[in-house]
């Protein structure tokens, strides 16, 4: 049975949730976000050391491997080291060997060469 006190508490929680979500929406709808005038350029999310061909799909694939590797080992050096030098490093190769079946490793190596130096 719902008491008036419980109903009042639920109403207060609902009001807080609605207020928080509407303020978050108004924050997201800032003039720069809605006008298409983004301050970040598309490549700013990726390592500037990657001077090869810019391919979002390949970068996402390589980044996902590093994320998965970090999720397995939970070591901060894995998270940062795997992406260093545009994936040309020992940590990336170790992650590749550990997580990717051997018949698919060449595909990741080719992606690394494409986006790399």
Swiss-Prot record:
Statement: the UniProt record of this protein carries the keyword DNA-binding: no
A single GO cellular-component term on record: extracellular region
Domain of life: Eukaryota
Keyword Transferase: no
Keywords linked to the UniProt accession: Amidation, Carbohydrate metabolism, Cleavage on pair of basic residues, Disulfide bond, Glucose metabolism, Hormone, Neuropeptide, Secreted, Signal
Gene3D superfamilies: Crustacean CHH/MIH/GIH neurohormone
Entry comment describing in which tissues the protein is expressed: Produced by the medulla terminalis X-organ in the eyestalks and transported to the sinus gland where they are stored and released.
Disulfide bonds: 50-86, 66-82, 69-95
Signal peptide location: 1-24
PROSITE patterns: CHH_MIH_GIH
Molecular function GO labels: neuropeptide hormone activity
Main location: secreted
Entry's Gene Ontology BP terms: circadian rhythm; glucose metabolic process; neuropeptide signaling pathway
UniProt subcellular location: Secreted
Valine amide modified-residue sites: 115
UniProt record similarity statement: Belongs to the arthropod CHH/MIH/GIH/VIH hormone family.
Entry function: Hormone found in the sinus gland of isopods and decapods which controls the blood sugar level. Has a secretagogue action over the amylase released from the midgut gland. May act as a stress hormone and may be involved in the control of molting and reproduction.
The protein, known as: Crustacean hyperglycemic hormones 3
Organism annotation: Penaeus japonicus (Kuruma prawn)
């Amino acid at each position: 049975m719902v008491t008036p006190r419980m109903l009042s508490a639920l109403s207060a929680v609902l009001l807080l949730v609605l207020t928080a979500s509407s303020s978050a929406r108004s924050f997201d709808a800032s003039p720069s976000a809605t006008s298409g005038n983004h301050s970040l350029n598309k490549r700013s999310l990726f390592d500037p050391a990657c001077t090869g061909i810019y391919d979002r799909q390949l970068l996402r694939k390589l980044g996902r491997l590093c994320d998965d590797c970090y999720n397995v080992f939970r070591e901060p050096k894995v998270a940062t080291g795997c992406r260093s030098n545009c994936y040309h490093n020992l940590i990336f190769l170790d992650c590749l060997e550990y997580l990717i079946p051997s018949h698919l490793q060449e595909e990741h190596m080719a992606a690394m060469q494409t986006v790399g130096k």
